[in-house]
Swiss-Prot record:
It holds the Pfam family Methyltransf_4. PROSITE patterns: SAM_MT_TRMB. Coiled coil: none annotated. Transmembrane segments: none annotated. It comes from Bacteroides thetaiotaomicron (strain ATCC 29148 / DSM 2079 / JCM 5827 / CCUG 10774 / NCTC 10582 / VPI-5482 / E50). It catalyses: guanosine(46) in tRNA + S-adenosyl-L-methionine = N(7)-methylguanosine(46) in tRNA + S-adenosyl-L-homocysteine. Its EC number is 2.1.1.33. HAMAP family: tRNA_methyltr_TrmB. S-adenosyl-L-methionine binds at E51, D76, N103, D125. This is tRNA (guanine-N(7)-)-methyltransferase. Catalyzes the formation of N(7)-methylguanine at position 46 (m7G46) in tRNA.
Amino acid sequence: MGKNKLEKFADMASYPHVFEYPYSAVDNVPFDMKGKWHQEFFGNDHPIVLELGCGRGEYTVGLGRMFPDKNFIAVDIKGSRMWTGATESLQAGMKNVAFLRTNIEIIERFFAAGEVSEIWLTFSDPQMKKATKRLTSTYFMERYRKFLKPDGIIHLKTDSNFMFTYTKYMIEANQLPVEFITEDLYHSDLVDDILSIKTYYEQQWLDRGLNIKYIKFRLPQEGVLQEPDVEIELDPYRSYNRSKRSGLQTSK
Protein backbone atom coordinates (compact mmCIF):
# COMPACT_ATOMS: atom_id res chain seq x y z
CA MET A 1 0.00 0.00 0.00
CA GLY A 2 1.36 3.43 -0.94
CA LYS A 3 2.18 6.05 1.65
CA ASN A 4 -0.09 9.03 2.24
CA LYS A 5 1.08 12.64 2.19
CA LEU A 6 1.71 12.88 5.93
CA GLU A 7 3.88 9.75 5.85
CA LYS A 8 5.81 11.13 2.89
CA PHE A 9 6.33 14.47 4.68
CA ALA A 10 7.67 12.58 7.70
CA ASP A 11 10.09 10.67 5.49
CA MET A 12 11.28 13.85 3.80
CA ALA A 13 11.95 15.51 7.15
CA SER A 14 14.23 12.61 8.11
CA TYR A 15 16.16 12.27 4.84
CA PRO A 16 19.76 13.55 5.11
CA HIS A 17 19.84 14.78 1.50
CA VAL A 18 16.60 16.78 1.68
CA PHE A 19 16.51 20.47 2.64
CA GLU A 20 13.09 22.01 3.31
CA TYR A 21 12.91 25.79 3.26
CA PRO A 22 9.56 27.04 1.94
CA TYR A 23 9.15 30.80 1.65
CA SER A 24 7.29 31.04 4.95
CA ALA A 25 10.27 29.51 6.79
CA VAL A 26 13.14 31.48 5.26
CA ASP A 27 11.86 35.03 5.00
CA ASN A 28 14.97 37.13 5.65
CA VAL A 29 16.71 34.15 7.30
CA PRO A 30 20.13 33.23 5.80
CA PHE A 31 20.60 29.70 4.44
CA ASP A 32 23.73 28.19 6.01
CA MET A 33 24.57 25.99 3.01
CA LYS A 34 24.71 28.93 0.58
CA GLY A 35 28.18 28.98 -0.94
CA LYS A 36 29.11 25.77 0.88
CA TRP A 37 27.33 23.03 -1.08
CA HIS A 38 30.61 21.65 -2.43
CA GLN A 39 32.51 21.33 0.82
CA GLU A 40 29.75 20.78 3.39
CA PHE A 41 27.32 18.53 1.54
CA PHE A 42 28.82 16.93 -1.57
CA GLY A 43 32.40 16.81 -0.31
CA ASN A 44 33.86 17.49 -3.76
CA ASP A 45 34.32 20.28 -6.28
CA HIS A 46 32.27 18.72 -9.08
CA PRO A 47 29.92 21.01 -11.06
CA ILE A 48 26.51 21.64 -9.50
CA VAL A 49 23.45 21.23 -11.73
CA LEU A 50 19.93 22.33 -10.70
CA GLU A 51 16.59 20.99 -11.88
CA LEU A 52 13.97 23.64 -11.16
CA GLY A 53 10.39 22.44 -10.86
CA CYS A 54 11.53 18.84 -10.58
CA GLY A 55 8.16 17.22 -9.85
CA ARG A 56 8.90 13.64 -8.81
CA GLY A 57 12.61 14.11 -9.33
CA GLU A 58 13.08 11.35 -11.92
CA TYR A 59 15.19 13.54 -14.18
CA THR A 60 17.58 14.49 -11.39
CA VAL A 61 17.95 10.86 -10.31
CA GLY A 62 18.53 9.78 -13.91
CA LEU A 63 21.17 12.46 -14.44
CA GLY A 64 22.81 11.60 -11.14
CA ARG A 65 23.21 7.98 -12.21
CA MET A 66 24.51 9.00 -15.62
CA PHE A 67 27.02 11.55 -14.34
CA PRO A 68 28.67 10.50 -11.06
CA ASP A 69 31.20 13.30 -11.63
CA LYS A 70 28.51 16.00 -11.30
CA ASN A 71 26.32 17.07 -8.37
CA PHE A 72 22.57 17.46 -8.86
CA ILE A 73 20.01 19.36 -6.80
CA ALA A 74 16.29 18.97 -7.54
CA VAL A 75 14.11 21.92 -6.54
CA ASP A 76 10.34 22.05 -6.09
CA ILE A 77 7.79 23.18 -3.50
CA LYS A 78 5.70 19.99 -3.67
CA GLY A 79 7.26 17.70 -1.08
CA SER A 80 4.88 14.79 -1.62
CA ARG A 81 5.93 14.59 -5.28
CA MET A 82 9.65 14.98 -4.58
CA TRP A 83 9.40 12.05 -2.16
CA THR A 84 9.58 9.62 -5.12
CA GLY A 85 13.00 10.73 -6.35
CA ALA A 86 14.30 11.48 -2.86
CA THR A 87 13.41 7.97 -1.70
CA GLU A 88 14.82 6.29 -4.81
CA SER A 89 18.14 8.16 -4.58
CA LEU A 90 18.44 7.44 -0.85
CA GLN A 91 17.78 3.73 -1.30
CA ALA A 92 20.32 3.65 -4.15
CA GLY A 93 22.96 5.27 -1.94
CA MET A 94 23.51 8.14 -4.36
CA LYS A 95 25.87 10.73 -2.89
CA ASN A 96 25.68 13.25 -5.74
CA VAL A 97 21.97 14.05 -5.47
CA ALA A 98 20.12 16.41 -3.13
CA PHE A 99 16.58 17.78 -2.93
CA LEU A 100 15.61 21.33 -1.97
CA ARG A 101 11.95 21.98 -1.17
CA THR A 102 11.36 25.67 -1.59
CA ASN A 103 9.72 28.30 -3.76
CA ILE A 104 11.68 28.90 -6.96
CA GLU A 105 10.87 32.61 -6.64
CA ILE A 106 13.52 32.79 -3.90
CA ILE A 107 16.03 30.39 -5.45
CA GLU A 108 18.90 32.92 -5.27
CA ARG A 109 18.82 32.70 -1.47
CA PHE A 110 20.30 29.20 -1.57
CA PHE A 111 23.32 29.54 -3.85
CA ALA A 112 26.31 31.88 -3.96
CA ALA A 113 27.67 33.65 -7.05
CA GLY A 114 29.14 31.15 -9.52
CA GLU A 115 28.15 28.14 -7.42
CA VAL A 116 25.92 26.55 -10.10
CA SER A 117 27.06 25.42 -13.58
CA GLU A 118 23.81 24.36 -15.26
CA ILE A 119 20.04 24.61 -14.87
CA TRP A 120 17.45 22.17 -16.22
CA LEU A 121 13.84 23.32 -16.71
CA THR A 122 11.87 20.15 -17.37
CA PHE A 123 8.21 20.56 -18.34
CA SER A 124 7.73 23.77 -16.39
CA ASP A 125 4.26 25.30 -16.19
CA PRO A 126 4.22 27.78 -19.13
CA GLN A 127 2.39 30.35 -17.00
CA MET A 128 0.59 31.72 -20.02
CA LYS A 129 -1.11 34.55 -18.12
CA LYS A 130 1.89 36.17 -16.48
CA ALA A 131 5.40 36.41 -17.93
CA THR A 132 7.11 37.07 -14.59
CA LYS A 133 6.08 33.60 -13.40
CA ARG A 134 7.68 31.80 -16.36
CA LEU A 135 10.95 30.12 -15.48
CA THR A 136 12.51 31.32 -18.75
CA SER A 137 11.44 34.96 -18.32
CA THR A 138 14.01 37.72 -17.88
CA TYR A 139 12.63 38.03 -14.34
CA PHE A 140 14.06 34.59 -13.58
CA MET A 141 17.13 35.01 -15.80
CA GLU A 142 18.18 37.89 -13.54
CA ARG A 143 17.80 35.58 -10.55
CA TYR A 144 19.82 32.83 -12.23
CA ARG A 145 22.62 35.29 -12.95
CA LYS A 146 23.12 35.72 -9.21
CA PHE A 147 24.41 32.16 -8.80
CA LEU A 148 25.05 30.72 -12.28
CA LYS A 149 28.62 30.68 -13.57
CA PRO A 150 29.38 33.15 -16.39
CA ASP A 151 27.96 31.71 -19.63
CA GLY A 152 26.32 28.95 -17.60
CA ILE A 153 24.07 26.52 -19.46
CA ILE A 154 20.27 26.48 -19.30
CA HIS A 155 18.26 23.55 -20.71
CA LEU A 156 14.55 23.82 -21.50
CA LYS A 157 12.65 20.63 -22.23
CA THR A 158 8.93 21.18 -22.75
CA ASP A 159 5.71 19.93 -24.31
CA SER A 160 4.34 23.49 -24.44
CA ASN A 161 4.55 25.31 -27.76
CA PHE A 162 3.77 28.53 -25.89
CA MET A 163 6.72 28.08 -23.52
CA PHE A 164 9.04 27.07 -26.36
CA THR A 165 8.02 30.02 -28.55
CA TYR A 166 8.23 32.52 -25.71
CA THR A 167 11.70 31.28 -24.76
CA LYS A 168 12.88 31.60 -28.37
CA TYR A 169 11.72 35.22 -28.42
CA MET A 170 13.39 35.91 -25.08
CA ILE A 171 16.66 34.43 -26.36
CA GLU A 172 16.46 36.41 -29.61
CA ALA A 173 15.62 39.68 -27.84
CA ASN A 174 18.75 39.32 -25.72
CA GLN A 175 21.01 37.64 -28.30
CA LEU A 176 21.79 34.77 -25.94
CA PRO A 177 24.07 32.05 -27.38
CA VAL A 178 22.07 28.97 -28.46
CA GLU A 179 23.84 25.61 -28.59
CA PHE A 180 20.93 23.49 -29.81
CA ILE A 181 17.23 23.94 -30.56
CA THR A 182 14.57 21.58 -31.90
CA GLU A 183 10.78 21.49 -32.07
CA ASP A 184 10.70 17.68 -32.14
CA LEU A 185 13.38 16.20 -29.92
CA TYR A 186 12.74 12.53 -30.57
CA HIS A 187 12.95 13.02 -34.34
CA SER A 188 16.10 15.17 -34.19
CA ASP A 189 19.80 14.36 -34.29
CA LEU A 190 20.24 14.98 -30.56
CA VAL A 191 18.45 12.12 -28.86
CA ASP A 192 21.37 11.20 -26.64
CA ASP A 193 21.28 9.41 -23.31
CA ILE A 194 20.70 12.61 -21.33
CA LEU A 195 17.72 13.82 -23.30
CA SER A 196 16.17 10.37 -23.54
CA ILE A 197 15.49 10.32 -19.78
CA LYS A 198 11.69 10.55 -19.59
CA THR A 199 9.73 11.82 -16.61
CA TYR A 200 6.28 10.57 -15.64
CA TYR A 201 4.63 13.66 -17.11
CA GLU A 202 6.74 13.64 -20.26
CA GLN A 203 5.48 10.16 -21.07
CA GLN A 204 1.93 11.50 -20.70
CA TRP A 205 2.59 14.17 -23.34
CA LEU A 206 4.20 11.64 -25.67
CA ASP A 207 1.24 9.30 -25.25
CA ARG A 208 -1.02 12.18 -26.29
CA GLY A 209 1.01 12.67 -29.45
CA LEU A 210 2.69 15.93 -28.43
CA ASN A 211 6.16 16.78 -29.71
CA ILE A 212 8.83 17.41 -27.10
CA LYS A 213 10.76 20.62 -27.67
CA TYR A 214 14.26 21.39 -26.42
CA ILE A 215 16.55 24.41 -26.22
CA LYS A 216 20.08 24.55 -24.81
CA PHE A 217 21.45 28.06 -24.39
CA ARG A 218 23.96 30.04 -22.35
CA LEU A 219 23.36 32.99 -20.02
CA PRO A 220 26.11 35.63 -20.04
CA GLN A 221 26.49 37.82 -16.96
CA GLU A 222 26.77 41.08 -18.87
CA GLY A 223 24.03 43.09 -20.56
CA VAL A 224 20.62 44.42 -19.54
CA LEU A 225 17.98 41.80 -20.27
CA GLN A 226 14.94 42.84 -22.32
CA GLU A 227 11.57 41.13 -22.02
CA PRO A 228 10.16 40.29 -25.50
CA ASP A 229 7.10 42.29 -26.53
CA VAL A 230 5.23 39.77 -28.67
CA GLU A 231 1.85 38.05 -28.79
CA ILE A 232 2.07 34.25 -28.65
CA GLU A 233 -0.68 31.75 -29.39
CA LEU A 234 -1.81 29.95 -26.27
CA ASP A 235 -1.57 26.18 -25.92
CA PRO A 236 -4.99 24.78 -26.90
CA TYR A 237 -4.90 21.77 -24.58
CA ARG A 238 -5.24 21.24 -20.88
CA SER A 239 -2.54 19.23 -19.18
CA TYR A 240 -1.83 18.14 -15.64
CA ASN A 241 -2.32 21.10 -13.28
CA ARG A 242 -2.35 23.48 -16.25
CA SER A 243 -5.06 25.34 -18.10
CA LYS A 244 -5.42 28.50 -20.12
CA ARG A 245 -7.66 29.90 -17.36
CA SER A 246 -8.61 32.54 -19.87
CA GLY A 247 -10.73 33.02 -22.95
CA LEU A 248 -7.84 34.74 -24.71
CA GLN A 249 -6.18 33.13 -27.71
CA THR A 250 -2.81 34.86 -27.33
CA SER A 251 -0.67 36.27 -24.56
CA LYS A 252 2.61 38.09 -24.02
